Amino acid sequence: MNPNLAILLGLLPAVMLAGGALVCAALALVRPGTRTSLYRWITLLSTVAAFVASMLELTAMTHDATGVGAVDYQGGLIIDRFHVFGTVLVCGVVALTVLGAQAYLRRAAGRAGAFCALLLLSAAASSMLLAQREMAAFTVDFALLIACLVLLTAMTKTSGVTAEAAFRQVLSGGVALATAVYGLVLVYAATGTTDLSRLATGLRVDGTRVDPVLAVVGIGLVIVGLLIVVGAPPLQAWTRHIQEAAPGPIAGFSSALGVVTGVAVLSRYGVEGFGAGSSRWTVLVDVLAAVAMLSGGVLAIRASTIRRLIADLSIVQAGFLLLAAGATAKTISGQAAAGPTALLYALMAAATSLVAALLLAGIFDAAGLGTGLEAYRGAGRRSPTTAGFLALALLALAGLPPLAGFIARLLIAETALDAGAGWAVAAAAVATTLSGVALFRWLSVMYAEDENESPFAVTTTPLVSRVTAWTAAVLGLLLAAFAGPLLSIAGGGATALH
């Protein structure tokens, strides 16, 4: 591929998204009373433009069997199928969010421009994070992503809970960024370069051996820093605050974008930087995955509100994604690891289930229904359509059959077993059982008889937003029905990481 063309195509999706953000911000400043529908259209058009740019990037790599078009700026910009896959998934999350946020934008019309600008800017940061393995580029993009997600939560000024959540996000986000950057400093000291791929060679730029202690500690700190957007222990409080306090569209977007970006970046760094299958990082990731799955399952059993249930199930889900990210070693039979392929398919299922569950929970919030377990008693009979789709989204989030989340977890368990992490698979089985018990506790209440039911109407949320939320929930079924072709697409996206 022509180097100049490669750079242009690699930057184009992020430029389209950032350009849309700039237009929304400028319009909000120049014409404060602009209709919210115009901001939605700008956001959707920018997202479509980024998608088209990604397809152009993919077309330019048609003849590259490795799936890698070019690597420029010492790993600061990577044009490959993995970047294309991640960017398209991010665009899908943005589209679902802006279509599902109509009710929120009506209530906060004065902040619609800022909302859409932050959506697009955070998506641009995510796209750039997926296209690099260089320390300076990572620091700038990661800081921008954290800042945008914090501001999205802080925009909801009508609730003291969201203000507190935003403040806590600032604190935890600062800690995570500092942790990751300090880890990168140690890696730089060990390798003598900002290109993380040098770690995999085991040699510094001057030809001497990499200091193993600095490398291992640095890798560990980078991984821990990334966990803030993934939503896994020890930094799961970041996403829990968003999921419990923020409006449904913001909570769904931040959770889905964070998990897609964080796990995908970790997967790229692990394979291309830390060394595929290297125990320097896979052991830590497997341990963190087991802790996330078990702690999330236990917390889900005790969940007293619908938002906490979603947050706890998402912790379990984050653990499964980490398990897939760590399954990069060759199998016992010597074949290439299938972990990256399983991971990309699982990210599709994870993103759609998170967006769907939180959009649907937001619809019930807007209808005046409480968030507690008893408030949902009989909701399945009072609002059968929306409650049914919420149940579908929760089943997908919990990884139960016959939805895509279940298929993804089976694939992840298989790849983890092949990579020699059978003990982590055992923890995954326990966590899935706990998640199922917690979910069926809620579903039994949702479809129970209750003579003292308080009335509510989901029609307070516009039809477009409700249909979007229902569609996101149905995607769990569609991803399962077309698992074969989608796994082939995921395999193509993972080519660069094998």
Residue ranges and their predicted role:
Residues 1-498:
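Alpha-helical transmembrane segments of multi-pass membrane proteins predominantly involved
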